């Protein structure tokens, strides 16, 4: 009797990769982690499941619609939707055990109940860093963040990218001086300028009820461009008598000055007054990073300064600054643009050891020796024709095949074939190790 077969499938919006893509993805993740650690950030992992009251402490609304929520017994539980709220809970809970400023990185999956559409994921990796202060946090931390972004994306293989920097106090102070009431609405409209253009922003501002004279002032303001020093000079010349605005300009000038000290090339960062970052909790410096040759990808790394990370969990004032790389989205978009993944290998193996005839024990010794020398190696153990064994290596793009036949066994040598050039020669195992390690 034929048994029922369940059709193998996964839910839309969840991530699953074939080996070649998974290897590329993991290398990107390792590169990001390496750079975060290079700047002294320590690893943190928190539970995937949190109490719903923790995740919803700020209030429901859009967050409540997006989280995966369920009950286990009498406990109301949810899957985390970002890494920032768990950080706030963690720092509040373990406050007395932590050293401040607390520098942590967290690379892990988060979950959101997004609508199923292209470019939207329900399960995805975020790669976050944050520097949390106790009571206060030097503004120079805000200047160090772009150097971390720069080093990370450079090591990921990018040269032509721009870190766009602004300060929310500059925007808020300007709006106060312009007598704009719905500042959140205006910030959200400005934040969409990349997607909807200047005319779209103008239309949204009209829908918010702003008169044309105020809209013109806002549009003229966000269009202030030039070198970093020219933009700062233009902001000062606006002569806005507002303390918040003045503080924002001062902070922006200081951050830009110190970014240079952190050896970030001038071409890789600029002041952009359209950068608002839609999230309400940003209170100072804000960042967005774009790959200049691939504007359709949008921001690949963003973040900013916030005054009070954990106000819903503690009375301690915990200011911070941080960024997040949405790795899953970045990976898929880079792959779609054919920037990564072309001709990627489906294995990590550097060598495939193939026993021919009665040479299994010597072949095992050879594989052991390769691994002792940090060469990732496979041993082909299946009974198959030699052509099939070579086809296996070729399909996986294993660069070297080591053949062990009766002659190699007698002479205690190995026969090494370079799969790219087709060259094959007999040599000592020590020579083979040297060649493979130097390849």
UniProtKB/Swiss-Prot annotation:
GO terms for cellular component: cytoplasm. GO terms for molecular function: ATP binding; catalytic activity, acting on a protein; histidine-tRNA ligase activity; transferase activity. It catalyses: tRNA(His) + L-histidine + ATP = L-histidyl-tRNA(His) + AMP + diphosphate + H(+). Its EC number is 6.1.1.21. GO terms for biological process: histidyl-tRNA aminoacylation. It holds the Pfam family tRNA-synt_His. Belongs to the class-II aminoacyl-tRNA synthetase family. Homodimer. InterPro entries: aa-tRNA-synth_II (IPR006195), aa-tRNA-synth_II/BPL/LPL (IPR045864), Anticodon-bd (IPR004154), Anticodon-bd_dom_sf (IPR036621), His-tRNA-ligase (IPR015807), HisRS-like_core (IPR041715), HisRS/HisZ (IPR004516), HisRS_anticodon (IPR033656). Keywords: Aminoacyl-tRNA synthetase, ATP-binding, Cytoplasm, Ligase, Nucleotide-binding, Protein biosynthesis. This is Histidine--tRNA ligase. Its main location: cytoplasm. It is found in: Cytoplasm.
């Amino acid at each position: 009797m034929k048994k029922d077969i369940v059709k193998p499938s996964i839910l839309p919006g969840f991530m699953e990769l074939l080996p070649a893509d998974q290897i590329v993805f993991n290398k990107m993740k390792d590169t990001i982690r390496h750079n975060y650690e290079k700047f002294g950030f320590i690893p943190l992992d928190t539970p995937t499941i949190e109490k719903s009251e923790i995740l919803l402490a700020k209030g429901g609304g859009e967050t409540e619609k997006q989280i995966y929520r369920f009950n286990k017994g009498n406990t109301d539980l949810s899957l985390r939707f970002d890494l920032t709220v768990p950080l706030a809970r963690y720092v509040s809970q373990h406050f007395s055990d932590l050293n401040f400023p607390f520098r942590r990185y967290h690379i892990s999956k988060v979950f959101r109940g997004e609508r199923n559409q292209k470019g939207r994921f329900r399960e995805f990796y975020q790669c976050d860093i944050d520097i949390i202060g106790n009571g206060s946090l030097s503004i120079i931390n805000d200047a160090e963040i772009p150097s971390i972004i720069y080093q990370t994306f450079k090591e990921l293989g990018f040269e032509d990218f721009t870190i766009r920097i602004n300060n929310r106090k500059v925007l808020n102070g300007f709006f106060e001086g312009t007598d704009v009431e719905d500042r959140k609405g205006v910030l959200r409209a400005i934040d969409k300028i990349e997607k909807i253009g200047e005319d779209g922003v103008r239309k949204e501002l009209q829908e918010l009820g702003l008169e044309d004279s105020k809209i013109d002032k806002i549009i003229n303001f966000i269009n202030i461009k030039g070198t970093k020093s020219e933009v700062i000079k233009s902001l000062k010349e606006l002569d806005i008598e507002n303390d918040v605005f003045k503080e924002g300009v001062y902070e922006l000038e200081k951050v830009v000055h110190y970014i240079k000290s952190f050896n970030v090339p001038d071409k890789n960062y600029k002041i952009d007054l359209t950068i608002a970052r839609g999230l309400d909790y940003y209170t100072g410096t804000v960042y967005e990073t774009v790959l200049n040759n691939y504007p359709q990808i949008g921001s690949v790394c963003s973040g900013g300064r916030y005054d009070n990370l954990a106000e819903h969990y503690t009375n301690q004032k915990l200011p911070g600054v941080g960024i997040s790389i949405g790795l899953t989205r970045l990976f898929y978009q880079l792959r779609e643009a054919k920037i990564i993944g072309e001709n990627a290998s489906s294995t990590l193996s550097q060598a495939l050891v193939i026993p021919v005839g009665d040479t299994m024990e010597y072949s095992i010794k050879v594989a052991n020796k390769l691994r002792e020398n940090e060469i990732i190696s496979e041993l082909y153990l299946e009974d198959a024709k030699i052509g099939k064994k070579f086809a296996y290596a070729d399909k996986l793009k294993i660069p070297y095949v080591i053949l062990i036949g009766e002659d190699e066994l007698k002479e205690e040598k190995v026969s090494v074939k370079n799969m790219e050039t087709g060259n094959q020669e007999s040599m000592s195992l020590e020579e083979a190790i040297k060649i493979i390690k130097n390849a």
